[in-house]
Amino acid sequence: TIHSYTGDQRTVDTLHKDPRRARAAALNMIPTSTGAAKAVGLVLPHLKGKLDGTSIRVPTPNVSVVSLDFVPTRTPASAEAVNEAIRAASLEGPLKGILEYNTAPLVSSDFNHDKASSIFDATQTVLVDGGKMVRVCSWYDNEWGFSNRMADTAALFGSL
């Protein structure tokens, strides 16, 4: 994950048990750990132990991007097939309104306050080794997307 810095990071160089986390967030790209890959295994048990990841905190005030490399179950994969599967999932079914599909050449600030939890960037789909491995990217406004999911949850509870 390439992640915008957050409020728990230092604004000036200071002391921290992790020397990298001690550095000024707005001035540095900071490699660090992430709990996101482990969290996926909690939500999707069949993926437990099959994902790992790292995070680089970057000096942007908001919006992050996930770069995910995976080995497709059907090889060789094509970028068109991968993109179409994501596009279809964004238009119908349980991910409608949560996953968005984008083909415009946008940058991080363009996704600020996007209500979706994930905005798939079809322009960044890359095939490696003739489609034996695929890299995809998806943008997100961490706080705003999460807040919208909490509003969805509150509305669901209110309808019970």
What are the residue ranges of the model-derived segments?
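Short beta-strand segments
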Residues: T1-I2, W139
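C-terminal substrate-binding/catalytic lobe of Rossmann-fold NAD(P)-dependent oxidoreductases
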Residues: H3-V134
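Glycine-rich phosphate/pyrophosphate-binding beta-alpha loops
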Residues: R57-P61, W139-F146
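Internal hydrophobic alpha-helix adjacent to the cofactor/substrate pocket in enzyme cavities
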Residues: N148-L160
